[in-house]
Swiss-Prot record:
GO biological process, one term: intracellular protein transmembrane transport
Subunit structure: Forms a complex with TatA.
Annotated source species: Blattabacterium sp. subsp. Periplaneta americana (strain BPLAN) (Periplaneta americana symbiotic bacterium)
Pfam families, A to Z: TatC
Name of the molecule in the record: Sec-independent protein translocase protein TatC
InterPro entries recorded: TatC
Job of this protein: Part of the twin-arginine translocation (Tat) system that transports large folded proteins containing a characteristic twin-arginine motif in their signal peptide across membranes.
Localization (cell): Cell inner membrane
Gene responsible for this protein: tatC
Family classification: Belongs to the TatC family.
Keyword Cell membrane among UniProt keywords: yes
Domain of life assignment: Bacteria
Bilayer-spanning residue ranges: 28-48, 93-113, 134-154, 183-203, 221-241, 242-262
One Gene Ontology cellular component: TAT protein transport complex
Keywords of this entry: Cell inner membrane, Cell membrane, Membrane, Protein transport, Translocation, Transmembrane, Transmembrane helix, Transport
Amino acid sequence: MKNEKNEMPFWEHIEELRKHLIHSVCAMIIATIILMNNKNVIFDYILFGPAKTDFITYRLFHKLGKIFHRSHHSFYFFSHNLEIQNRQIFGQFNIYVWTCFIGGFILSFPYIFYEFWKFIKPALSDEERKYSRGIIMMVTFLFILGVLFGYFILCPFLIHFGYTFRISSFPRNIFDLSDYISLIMHSILSMGITFLFPIFIYFLTKIELISYPFLKKYRKHAFLILLILASAITPGDIFSTIVVLIPLMILYQFSIYISFYVSKKK
């Protein structure tokens, strides 16, 4: 049996949606203000972390490089901090506002999804609600996992590749502030959304736009695409490619299991 909220007139649905949107925007504004009041922590310790030689990922892979008999100067190690420059009068202020705004969205994303779920939940049947239990926790977990993967794995690889790639020994690589911050924020947000792939598969299977046999049949093709994607976003050696590829393959395989579970319950 569906909730009587389904019988609400159209404009009452719009009013209900407006309420959830206001709550989401308020949460995002609060998160943005919190980030703005912690500028030093956000920029010096978090966003500029991958630009420093002592970043945890570089230290970890430097040690792994020694274990696997690489040279003393590990492929994942910088000899000095990266040079980042700002060339616009209001560049730092614009970056400050834009970064805190995007960061506010990332920080409040679980709550925003919660508000979205509260809006659509009354339209679900009791059986659909039963199989959707824990969806908020799962979305939050996968999104945070993707954000961490983007920050600690993807960002260092991309930055290292951009810093070490040379067309000639003549030009120096000095990063532009806006390009650097955009790379960090884009990597974090895109990986957070990418890790929600199993959730998308769940709903696509529920509405029968995709099926378990289809995902299983084209698994090898999907893995090949993931391999190409991982190779494109990593420096080029096999080890870094595998590090990025494995989580993507696990996500796809997990999505197959989810599709099978949903299909079986129908």
